[in-house]
């Protein structure tokens, strides 16, 4: 399908070049299918192609008209089933198993379809991303309220302790955790992981360079940034002179005599970035049809050295960001393991008094949120490895609405929310609430 | 009947609310703490005893006495 829309798009470009104006999407579709498939399309088929599948450049508005999908039902119906099962209206183990698999499968399908809407259909425009980020913020605010209610119950109970627990907090005779042991390690783990993830995000969105005091690397970075600016401002005609200057810095002046050998070596390196280039640069212009001009020139005439510079830079950058993602995941897993250890060896239990109830309610829900955050970080790690956040997709500024890193940004917000809740938990339960 | 003075627990600013549960509990703890302090001599602890008896339901006192006997009462002071 993607190839079809590219052709459709190119047909439009051709039309702009030849006649100076765009043909309508439907006319273009008709034309292409006539040419390529050899038979004309019926009206309703054209309507289906142009209305149901709506690439960005074929719409007259920036919003995403979502397609019909079974995912929301597959997620919410099992939720209803869980409730009925909990109250004993329905009790069937097979039904529960089916509901659970439908719930998880629906979530997976929903996530993947949103990612595909963004990557292949190019539906995530500025406005759509703003809506997504706003939705995430609303969700986080609702989560804050959720935790606020539990903190309220904690303070209600602990500020004026009942006579049954000896009018003291923590309850008389109960052994509770010291704030200096595992909880402190957990605090360090969560805060460190948040900082590291933020660092990865700043590198991803190019707010921060990949640091290394190496002239070659700095030269490559600078060259790359300049190249990006040149391509993004569409003044790519004189890149070759610019690359010559960079080449001197990068390989030394004596290498000029060995240009041919160097270029042959670099052709090999550039092969690695070719796939990336084919995907990304097409997508860039595919995504920004307003950049198309009558003298539109496909950006395929990069020099070999430019490819090499980009390859080296991208490899280093990917490695650095990947390290940060892995480290964050590791921190999350160790945190969960520590919490599991603490739960397993707890001197109180959930049903032996008010302290245990509140402790497990608060830390348990927080632990569940850490688990969800870890899953989100896992998703963005996979997306990063697969290449969803490639450089041209991501953009070069901290503009969450203008780049393709919205998923990363939302995960980051969520992770920081989990961090902050933990800080309150640590201060209130482990520190203030201990002896 | 004429000579008998009826007296309830005096006002205590630590417990200004209508709910006097904790006031009762504090008097129970104070009474037995006082007895413990004077090595079983309860003659100086009558204020606490009177307040306790006028504030606390009898069932609570007997329950707490049982807890105290079984060493389960949630306080160090009794």
UniProtKB/Swiss-Prot annotation, chain A:
From which domain of life does this come?
Answer: Eukaryota
Which EC numbers does the record give? Answer: 7.1.1.9
What InterPro entries does this protein's entry cite? Cyt_c/ubiquinol_Oxase_su3, Cyt_c_oxase_su3_dom, Cyt_c_oxidase-like_su3, Cyt_c_oxidase_su3-like_sf, Cyt_c_oxidase_su3_a-hlx
Record field: transmembrane? 70-90, 96-116, 132-152, 176-196, 325-345, 360-380, 412-432
Q: How does it sit in the membrane?
A: Multi-pass membrane protein
Concerning Pfam families, the annotation shows: COX3
* Molecular function via GO: cytochrome-c oxidase activity
Quote the protein name from its UniProt record. Cytochrome c oxidase subunit 3
Assembly and oligomerization: Component of the cytochrome c oxidase (complex IV, CIV), a multisubunit enzyme composed of a catalytic core of 3 subunits and several supernumerary subunits. The complex exists as a monomer or a dimer and forms supercomplexes (SCs) in the inner mitochondrial membrane with ubiquinol-cytochrome c oxidoreductase (cytochrome b-c1 complex, complex III, CIII).
Enzyme class comes to translocase
Say which family it is in: Belongs to the cytochrome c oxidase subunit 3 family.
Q: Keywords in UniProt for this one? A: Membrane, Mitochondrion, Mitochondrion inner membrane, Translocase, Transmembrane, Transmembrane helix
- Write down the PANTHER family for this protein, in alphabetical order: CYTOCHROME C OXIDASE SUBUNIT 3, CYTOCHROME C OXIDASE SUBUNIT III
Q: Which GO terms describe its biological process?
A: mitochondrial electron transport, cytochrome c to oxygen
What this chain does, per the entry, is described as:
Component of the cytochrome c oxidase, the last enzyme in the mitochondrial electron transport chain which drives oxidative phosphorylation. The respiratory chain contains 3 multisubunit complexes succinate dehydrogenase (complex II, CII), ubiquinol-cytochrome c oxidoreductase (cytochrome b-c1 complex, complex III, CIII) and cytochrome c oxidase (complex IV, CIV), that cooperate to transfer electrons derived from NADH and succinate to molecular oxygen, creating an electrochemical gradient over the inner membrane that drives transmembrane transport and the ATP synthase.
- Substrates-to-products reaction catalysed: 4 Fe(II)-[cytochrome c] + O2 + 8 H(+)(in) = 4 Fe(III)-[cytochrome c] + 2 H2O + 4 H(+)(out)
Gene label: cox3
Under the heading SUPFAM superfamilies, the entry gives:
Cytochrome c oxidase subunit III-like
Curated annotation (Swiss-Prot), chain B:
Q: Name one Pfam family in it.
A: COX6B
Which superkingdom is the protein from?
Answer: Eukaryota
**What is one GO biological process annotated to this record?**
oxidative phosphorylation
**Keywords for the protein's UniProt record, in alphabetical order:** Disulfide bond, Membrane, Mitochondrion, Mitochondrion inner membrane
Motif extent (Cx9C motif): 24-34
**Domain CHCH: where?**
21-64
Q: In which pathway does it act?
A: Energy metabolism; oxidative phosphorylation
Renumbered ranges of motif Cx10C motif: 45-56
Membrane disposition: Peripheral membrane protein
Q: Where in the cell is it found?
A: Mitochondrion inner membrane
Disulfide-bonded cysteines: 24-56, 34-45
Q: Does the keyword Nucleotide-binding apply?
A: no
GO cellular component entries: mitochondrial inner membrane; mitochondrion; respiratory chain complex IV
InterPro entries according to UniProt: COX6B-like, CX6/COA6-like_sf, Cyt_c_oxidase_su6B
Task: Answer yes or no on keyword Ion transport.
Answer: no
Q: What is its main location?
A: mitochondrion
* Subunit note: Component of the cytochrome c oxidase (complex IV, CIV), a multisubunit enzyme composed of a catalytic core of 3 subunits and several supernumerary subunits. The complex exists as a monomer or a dimer and forms supercomplexes (SCs) in the inner mitochondrial membrane with ubiquinol-cytochrome c oxidoreductase (cytochrome b-c1 complex, complex III, CIII).
Function field: Component of the cytochrome c oxidase, the last enzyme in the mitochondrial electron transport chain which drives oxidative phosphorylation. The respiratory chain contains 3 multisubunit complexes succinate dehydrogenase (complex II, CII), ubiquinol-cytochrome c oxidoreductase (cytochrome b-c1 complex, complex III, CIII) and cytochrome c oxidase (complex IV, CIV), that cooperate to transfer electrons derived from NADH and succinate to molecular oxygen, creating an electrochemical gradient over the inner membrane that drives transmembrane transport and the ATP synthase.
Q: What is this protein called?
A: Probable cytochrome c oxidase subunit 6B
Gene source species: Dictyostelium discoideum
